[in-house]
Amino acid sequence: MPCIQAQYGTPATSPGPRDHLTGDPLALEFSKPTMDLASPETAPTAPATLPSFSTFMDGGYTGEFDTFLYQLPGTAQPCSSASSTSSSSSSATSPASASFKFEDFQVYGCYPGTLSGPLDETLSSSGSDYYGSPCSAPSPPTPNFQPSQLSPWDGSFGHFSPSQTYEGLRVWTEQLPKASGPPPPPTFFSFSPPTGPSPSLAQSSLKLFPAPATHQLGEGESYSVPAAFPGLAPTSPNCDTSGILDAPVTSTKARSGSSGGSEGRCAVCGDNASCQHYGVRTCEGCKGFFKRTVQKSAKYICLANKDCPVDKRRRNRCQFCRFQKCLAVGMVKEVVRTDSLKGRRGRLPSKPKQPPDASPTNLLTSLIRAHLDSGPNTAKLDYSKFQELVLPRFGKEDAGDVQQFYDLLSGSLDVIRKWAEKIPGFIELSPGDQDLLLESAFLELFILRLAYRSKPGEGKLIFCSGLVLHRLQCARGFGDWIDNILAFSRSLHSLGVDVPAFACLSALVLITDRHGLQDPRRVEELQNRIASCLKEHMAAVAGDPQPASCLSRLLGKLPELRTLCTQGLQRIFCLKLEDLVPPPPIVDKIFMDTLSF
């Protein structure tokens, strides 16, 4: 079949069809372009000689553009080799060359897309001169064209140089036959020399290999090839470049040994991170920020919408969002040590002071000592005012009897206050709670302590000051209340309560829940300790087969004590109405504060 062979070599002064092509490779139209050989623009493009095909393979062509072989289909009239002097006239008269289309050529080269034509499309062994260039359709030959020597990355496409991503290769495969199954990832192309003189596309060795799925180029990175191929300079057509094209693409950062993805990056701000801190790979800055925040229990406030960006450049702008991101990526607050000294210098923290009477034995001993110290000496009782034979007087009480009643109450209050201060744990309460407990339990403690010291069988009442009075001596001032106190004293003595049990019972009357306490939890803890101490003592009493029943009977006296307290308030109220003697301020205050409860 006769053919016409053409090669690049158009003189610089002769304009060619390439000048009419647009600079945008995306704007090139490959849909059946038509060429007229009779045109004056294409007439002088025929070279003087028609070299053989080996010229392309052995001539050492180093131009920038690829080499293509054009083969015209045979017609009824054979096509002879054209010369430079007769190409104009023969093209105008020959029926074979009168008009033909670009698709009638057999093209050996690299071009994107698929040219629709009756002939098979082929691929030549001379692919792109540099890796990753978007191959475009070749221009018609221009005689004596001298390509400029450019770097392998600065092609003639100018602003349309190949991008450094894999997206530019996507359009190369859009017109390939669709394969069944899920779409493959972006691929690289590798062209090998054809095995036959005119292989088809189905027979051409088109190698596809997927790009690394996890590798992404960072900012400022560039493509590079393995060390076996140090450069990608333009090579001659007869040089096999399939090895270079088949080599996987690696980045500069990948060659240095760092893996792709987020490994080696701070999970909070994206800065360099060498190891894990508090369960997450973070940088030193975010590690220190998280540690300081947890140790100081710092509270931050976001001035925006709590969605501030946290990166290497803006991580110090919003501390709230930075700490929230630390928690979101998985940093654990419990891992942070909070017992470290500031600067790891200074004195060790002092040990918390333990109360000296923490054990039940020590607590019981302290309660007994407090009770004995607050009571009168039985060997030195004051009988100076005691009168056993007193004639009963009928009628209203006089001012002397009322004043005696008020004096006995006021004197007991000072003694009870000193006794309470010796109870372990009482002085550790707030002053407000101490006053509230004393004023609320004063009348109950007055009755309990008086009933325990007195001798109801003899009618003797022994007060805290050591003063001994007969029941009849107190009848006008105390009224019927004194008889109820003596009855309570008989029942209390019938239980055989010893001093340790009575000391614990008195403390329980004082240390109890009251309305208006500032720290009721501490009062409850102290009450539980005293109750445990009383329970252990009752269980250790020898000769008692049922300590639980004895304890319940003892604690059953507390409701009776509350009833007697109410009767005492009623007596004070009656004396206030008679207004014979004004009550002391402390008694009046206790009455007014306790009456509402």
Curated annotation (Swiss-Prot):
Summary of the function given for this chain in its UniProt record: Orphan nuclear receptor. Binds the NGFI-B response element (NBRE) 5'-AAAGGTCA-3'. Binds 9-cis-retinoic acid outside of its ligand-binding (NR LBD) domain. Participates in energy homeostasis by sequestrating the kinase STK11 in the nucleus, thereby attenuating cytoplasmic AMPK activation. Regulates the inflammatory response in macrophages by regulating metabolic adaptations during inflammation, including repressing the transcription of genes involved in the citric acid cycle (TCA). Inhibits NF-kappa-B signaling by binding to low-affinity NF-kappa-B binding sites, such as at the IL2 promoter. In the cytosol, upon its detection of both bacterial lipopolysaccharide (LPS) and NBRE-containing mitochondrial DNA released by GSDMD pores during pyroptosis, it promotes non-canonical NLRP3 inflammasome activation by stimulating association of NLRP3 and NEK7.
Underlying gene: Nr4a1
Cofactor(s) listed: Zn(2+)
Species in which this protein is naturally found: Rattus norvegicus
Alphabetized PROSITE patterns for the sequence: NR_LBD (PS51843), NUCLEAR_REC_DBD_1 (PS00031), NUCLEAR_REC_DBD_2 (PS51030)
Keyword Protein biosynthesis in record: no
UniProt protein name: Nuclear receptor subfamily 4 group A member 1
ZnF (NR C4-type) intervals: 266-286, 302-326
Domain comment quoted from the record: The NR LBD domain binds the lipid A moiety of lipopolysaccharide (LPS) in the cytosol.
